[in-house]
Amino acid sequence: MPIHLEIVTAERVILSDDVDMISVPTKDGRVGILPRHAPLMTILEPGELDIIKNGERTPFAVSGGFMEVLPHRVTILADTVERADEIDEARAEQARAEAEARRREAQSEHDMALAEAKLRKEMVRLRVAQLHKIKRRQS
């Protein structure tokens, strides 16, 4: 019996499908969600979101957000989320370099926090894209 997953951003519905398992990065570490999971509401951290369906793993890069889990449905409200195969690695690398430069030049704690958050997001995007590229080569 699958669990229904909806991944939504402010711009669009990214995914609405029945899946076998979801693995997400939360404030308390990675959490795996299977059908009939206990109800849960949690904050998502930037990281790799994995969906398993019919034995196939589909990775996404998520920049943060919230997740609501009910026994037969999961709703993820993400700040941003991208499928691994949609990530432009060159643009992500450029954004990472810009975030590092902003961090070095930060004049206040607020500027530093913003630059570090952007840097974390871009590092996640790069890691997910690179892992996807390795997986494709092995297939």
From Swiss-Prot:
Function statement: Produces ATP from ADP in the presence of a proton gradient across the membrane.
One GO CC annotation: plasma membrane
UniProt KW Endoplasmic reticulum keyword: no
Main location class: membrane
Domain of life according to the entry: Bacteria
Pfam family, any one: ATP-synt_DE
Family to which the UniProt record says this protein belongs: Belongs to the ATPase epsilon chain family.
Name under which the protein is recorded: ATP synthase epsilon chain
Location in or out of the cell: Cell membrane
Keyword vocabulary terms for this entry: ATP synthesis, Cell membrane, CF(1), Hydrogen ion transport, Ion transport, Membrane, Transport
Stretch list, region Disordered: 89-110
Gene Ontology MF terms: ATP binding; proton-transporting ATP synthase activity, rotational mechanism
Transmembrane segments: none
Membrane topology: Peripheral membrane protein
Organism of derivation: Chloroflexus aggregans (strain MD-66 / DSM 9485)
Gene expressing this chain: atpC
CDD domains assigned: F1-ATPase_delta
Subunit structure: F-type ATPases have 2 components, CF(1) - the catalytic core - and CF(0) - the membrane proton channel. CF(1) has five subunits: alpha(3), beta(3), gamma(1), delta(1), epsilon(1). CF(0) has three main subunits: a, b and c.
